[in-house]
Amino acid sequence: MEKSNDHDKASHGGSGGGATEKWEETSLGIRTAETMLRLAPVGLCVAALVVMLKDSETNEFGSISYSNLTAFRYLVHANGICAGYSLLSAAIAAMPRSSSTMPRVWTFFCLDQLLTYLVLAAGAVSAEVLYLAYNGDSAITWSDACSSYGGFCHRATASVIITFFVVCFYIVLSLISSYKLFTRFDPPSIVDSAKNLEVAVFGS
């Protein structure tokens, strides 16, 4: 009888250890994927920032630089902030169990949302400026500028396109951080007054 009990304990212990190892492997895989996803925007942000910083042109019509346009200056600052946050958040996400605490989950959720809207706004206003630079606006007698400053417009366009790739990464990160936060809460429940039963809204 004692041998049988010992055997049962050993088998339960073995299965428990296997489950723990499997959970740790899954957790490590998720953490690695999230870390890589947070690192990816760093290079893109730096690329968009550098391209825009070097964007200037001088010809017989005069000189133009990214610093002459508020939207492009905002794009540079937004990409700089995004690169710094991406690097810092990737370092924190790579730490074992560091991102599992509730304050960290809330922090990632809020900052991921904030950075998504920040970079999206920078890309949107810069794209609007580029549209006017390429097409002008006949209603207010604005002529297009890109026919005279083609190189400037091409570099600005490249920077804006890269910025929208950053936005795509941050949309995915926002979805991940939202999922990690809201799966910690129980689904709301309703009370059936006729049966006096409490039923989960999303089922069992």
From Swiss-Prot:
Record's bilayer topology term: Multi-pass membrane protein
Q: Which UniProt keywords apply?
A: Cell membrane, Glycoprotein, Membrane, Transmembrane, Transmembrane helix
Extracellular compartment residues: 54-74, 135-155
Free-text tissue specificity from the UniProt record:
Expressed in the peripheral root cap and leaf epidermis.
- From which domain of life does this come? Eukaryota
**Annotated compartments:** Cell membrane
TM region positions: 33-53, 75-95, 114-134, 156-176
According to the record, glycans are attached at 68
GO cellular component, alphabetical, reads:
plasma membrane
Is the keyword Membrane in the record? Answer: yes
Q: Where is the composition biased (Basic and acidic residues)?
A: 1-11
Q: Where is this region: Disordered?
A: 1-21
Topology, Cytoplasmic side: 1-32, 96-113, 177-204
**Alphabetical list of Pfam families matching this protein:** CASP_dom
- Which PANTHER family does this one have? CASP-LIKE PROTEIN 2A1, CASP-LIKE PROTEIN 4A4
Its subunit composition reads: Homodimer and heterodimers.
Q: State the similarity comment.
A: Belongs to the Casparian strip membrane proteins (CASP) family.
Task: Please report the name of this protein according to its UniProt entry.
Answer: CASP-like protein 2A1
- Recorded source organism is Arabidopsis thaliana (Mouse-ear cress)
